[in-house]
């Protein structure tokens, strides 16, 4: 039977990513696998905002640090024995499949999909699509056309995210 030993889950603070994270926790527990929770701050966005907001980098890093800390706590409390977190700066489309997958020796990458429409995907592409195309290992994209009505995020709550929004 095929088992996964090192699962990488990409999170970005969206409810879709948290839904995928919950599934990654289940897969990690079933396989007794290491779970690496990653967040990549898109440096292209960062460079365009730097001129307008000198604190953007610090806010982004604090958001990501707290997000990853929350996910690590949830996974550990759910029974995942080996949970690591990684924060990177750069293009998520390149860093996740080409750098992080190798760095953590992932044999499965999991991610959510944000539900971009066809025009948006054509213009900006999707991170999940890039991961599928460039990954050296299996990829599971958790599709969610619409989150279940009873879904309540534990980490990426609206209240959590509002702490980091510009006022």
Swiss-Prot record:
InterPro entries, alphabetized: Rossmann-like_a/b/a_fold, Universal_stress_UspA, UspA
Source organism superkingdom: Bacteria
GO CC, alphabetical: cytoplasm
Protein's UniProt keywords contain Cytoplasm: yes
Disulphide linkage map: none
Keyword vocabulary terms for this entry: Cytoplasm
CDD domains reported for this sequence: USP-like
Protein location: Cytoplasm
Family recorded in the similarity comment: Belongs to the universal stress protein A family.
Protein name: Putative universal stress protein SSP1056
Source organism of the structure: Staphylococcus saprophyticus subsp. saprophyticus (strain ATCC 15305 / DSM 20229 / NCIMB 8711 / NCTC 7292 / S-41)
């Amino acid at each position: 039977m095929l088992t996964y030993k090192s699962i990488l889950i990409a999170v970005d603070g969206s409810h879709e990513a948290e839904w995928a994270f919950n599934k990654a926790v289940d897969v990690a527990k079933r396989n007794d696998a290491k779970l690496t929770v990653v967040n990549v701050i898109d440096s292209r966005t960062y460079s365009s905002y730097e001129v307008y907001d000198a604190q953007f980098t610090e806010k982004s890093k604090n958001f990501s640090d707290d997000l990853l800390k929350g996910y690590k706590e949830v996974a550990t409390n759910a029974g995942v024995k080996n949970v690591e977190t990684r924060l990177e700066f750069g293009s998520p489309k390149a860093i996740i499949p080409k750098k992080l997958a190798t760095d953590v020796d992932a044999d499965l990458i999991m991610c959510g999909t944000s539900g971009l429409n066809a025009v948006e995907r054509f213009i900006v592409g999707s991170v999940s699509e890039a991961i599928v195309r460039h990954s050296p290992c299996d990829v599971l994209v958790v599709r969610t056309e619409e989150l279940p009505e009873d879904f309540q995020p534990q980490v990426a709550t609206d209240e959590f995210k509002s702490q980091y929004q510009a006022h």
